[in-house]
């Protein structure tokens, strides 16, 4: 029950809690949850009340920045993990922050594109975009910057669905499907694949589909159409 909730953690913050015994929430991750005021970087009580979870305010851990030291590896965690006791543990960051940082996004003219389960395009700017043109604003791990994200579930999750349900089993499945895809020329007429098997943030009724399948199309054509639909 709600009364038994001690802390509300993001995944990495829970792992850090188990490593250190210290309960903290990290700002970039929590800003992506919609629970923070992006201008103050603190929990927004109005939003919590709007969501009907105002009573959980006390379960939200104190906020820290990505580079803050949030504790040290405990003796118990050291025994279980092999890490050295006393090792400092930083706050960490939102996964898409980590993607942008590792791609050297450090100025507004830099763009990071992620082809994971989701298709994510992101950049940073000194102010959030507030006119509704983008999917999400969150705090960037570099103070004073916001991470601007446009994304949808239209990337490699589609390929994973195909491999899980339709592809022939293989010990090296990705090499096999890459060979199949390469066997079809870009000039060939492939079906059109709409990559909305997990719906779309553009239209709630959008669904995934193959359009234009003919009798001469092979599995290789289908796989290539998935690649092209994602791209």
List each language-model region with its residue ranges.
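A conserved helix-loop-beta module that forms one wall/lid of the active-site cleft
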Residues: 52-65
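Active-site core segments that coordinate phosphate-bearing ligands/cofactors
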Residues: 1-24, 34-54, 69-231
């Amino acid at each position: 029950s709600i009364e038994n909730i001690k802390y509300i953690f993001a995944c990495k913050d829970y792992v850090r809690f188990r490593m250190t015994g210290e309960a903290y929430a990290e700002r970039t991750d929590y800003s992506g949850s919609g629970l923070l005021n992006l201008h103050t970087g603190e929990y927004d009580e109005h939003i919590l009340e709007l969501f009907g979870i105002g009573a959980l305010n006390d379960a939200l851990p104190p906020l820290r920045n990505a580079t803050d030291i949030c504790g040290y590896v405990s003796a118990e965690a050291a025994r279980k993990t092999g890490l050295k006791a006393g090792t400092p543990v930083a706050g960490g960051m939102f996964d898409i922050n980590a993607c942008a940082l590792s791609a050297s996004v450090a100025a507004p003219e830099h763009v990071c594109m992620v082809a994971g389960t989701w298709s994510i395009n992101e950049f940073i700017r000194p102010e959030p975009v507030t006119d509704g043109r983008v999917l999400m604003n969150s705090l960037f791990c570099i103070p004073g910057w916001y991470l601007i994200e446009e994304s949808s579930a239209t990337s490699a999750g589609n390929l994973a669905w195909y491999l899980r349900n339709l592809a022939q089993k293989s010990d090296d499945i990705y090499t096999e499907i890459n060979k199949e895809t390469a066997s079809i020329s870009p000039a060939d007429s492939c079906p059109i694949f709409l990559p909305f098997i997990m719906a779309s943030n553009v239209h709630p009724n959008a669904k995934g589909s193959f359009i234009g399948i003919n009798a001469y199309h092979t599995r290789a054509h289908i796989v290539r159409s998935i690649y092209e639909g994602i791209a």
